[in-house]
Design a protein with these regions (language model features):
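Transmembrane helix-bundle signature of multi-pass secondary active exporters and lipid flippases
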Residues: 48-56, 236, 240, 244, ...
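Membrane-interface junctions at transmembrane-helix termini in multi-pass inner-membrane proteins
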Residues: 134-158, 352-364
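Hydrophobic alpha-helical transmembrane segments
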Residues: 126, 156-208, 269-272
């Protein structure tokens, strides 16, 4: 439990550093006098939403497979004969190929649904695919790293490095080094592939990742259970992910000037994510311990983790929510953010309440 506490605290600090960088990015996107329009900022949020949905479809529940079965692979196989990450990356890559085929076939639908209210999305539609592929690979590698108790490292790449990549692009755009938004959004599409390469390089050079295409005895033994688990979890993951991003996509599709409205919604979403930082840290730190506890049927440890995480996260969520809600309008005015973003206050309120309820369930 002490190891979980230590890793979750460090992870939370790293995540909040990332949020600080993210808030700086948001300020550059939304401040008065910026080169970015509301539609430009909205397009970046739409890119992230669709890339997240692509990754959920493509990953084929491989992160859940890693979380559940890594203790068995780790216990019964030497590292160089462990084929888990090879299988997971291969299946996810095949899954993304299917996503690309489906995305290409649905281009006419995208034009029909988004052409009027979000023409920017139609213009840059194919540039979402590199972003989605990068996030797919990162999600699988992240799950593997969590199982190796490397949650702090993965949180640094996802929360800090990814936002620093964005910061660099923003600064280059503001200083006119990047001449137009066309180049900016195309480079932005490669930020997720960038952190995927970084995490892979870390695992490779620290000799914590090995590839083998020979089917191991563990894979053969648990094949039916692996398929059953992934089949069961896959639908739940899709529903959960779609519920997180569907609102952004619907706003971009149905509302007049949808990309700009998605930007306003995106600001409220970012403020809501500040509340979730401790939850992300605790989940990433505890997943490997929960997997081991379930394998060993260690019910006292499971009860301790779930109970303590629920109480601590609920208290923290309520406190941060109240602080942000009471100062939302003043913050917009004080920092010189465009007044149009004040309309996101009640969006934050609704999303914040749902986040409090979610965090009250602990690491579930």
């Amino acid at each position: 439990m002490s190891n979980i506490r230590r890793q979750s605290i460090i992870s939370s600090v790293v995540i909040y550093i990332g949020f600080a960088v993210g808030l700086l990015n948001t300020y550059f996107f939304t401040r008065q006098g910026t080169r970015f329009t509301e539609a430009d900022y909205g397009l970046t949020t739409i890119f992230i939403a669709i890339a997240t949905m692509m990754a959920a479809f493509a990953a084929m529940a491989m992160p859940s497979y890693i979380f559940k079965f890594h203790p068995y692979y780790n216990e019964h196989l030497p590292p160089k004969k462990n084929d888990m990450i090879t299988r997971a990356l291969l299946v996810s890559t095949i899954g993304f190929v299917l996503v690309v085929i489906a995305g290409w076939a649905m281009k006419h639908l995208v034009i029909r649904k988004f052409g009027t209210n979000s023409p920017q999305l139609v213009a840059y539609y194919y540039w979402i695919f590199p972003m989605g592929f990068g996030l797919t690979l990162y999600t699988v590698l992240e799950a593997y790293a969590w199982s190796l108790h490397k949650s702090v490292v993965t949180n640094f790449f996802r929360e800090v490095q990814w936002r620093l990549f964005t910061t660099v692009l923003i600064v280059l755009f503001i200083t006119n080094t990047i001449k137009d938004f066309d180049l900016f959004i195309k480079l932005f599409a490669f930020t997720y592939p960038g952190i995927a390469v970084s995490l892979f390089a870390y695992l490779f050079f620290t000799k914590q990742i090995h590839f083998t295409f020979k089917v191991s005895k563990v894979s053969r033994r648990f094949l039916k259970k692996i398929i059953a688990l992934c089949s069961f979890v896959y639908g739940g993951v899709l529903i959960f992910t779609i519920s997180k991003v569907f609102d952004t996509i619907v706003i971009a599709s149905l509302l007049n000037d949808g990309a700009a409205k998605a930007g306003i919604f995106g600001l409220a979403t970012i403020m809501t994510s500040i509340i979730q930082a401790p939850q992300r840290g605790i989940i990433s730190a505890s997943v490997s311990h929960l997997s081991k506890a379930w394998k060993d049927k260690n019910m006292p440890l499971l009860q301790k983790i779930y109970q303590r995480s629920s109480i601590n996260l609920l208290i923290f969520a309520c406190a941060i929510f109240l602080l942000i809600w009471m100062n939302f309008a003043d913050g917009i005015t004080t920092f010189g953010v465009k007044p149009v973003y004040l309309s996101g206050a009640w969006i934050f309120f609704i999303l914040g309440v749902t986040t409090i309820i979610d965090m009250g369930t602990g690491v579930n």
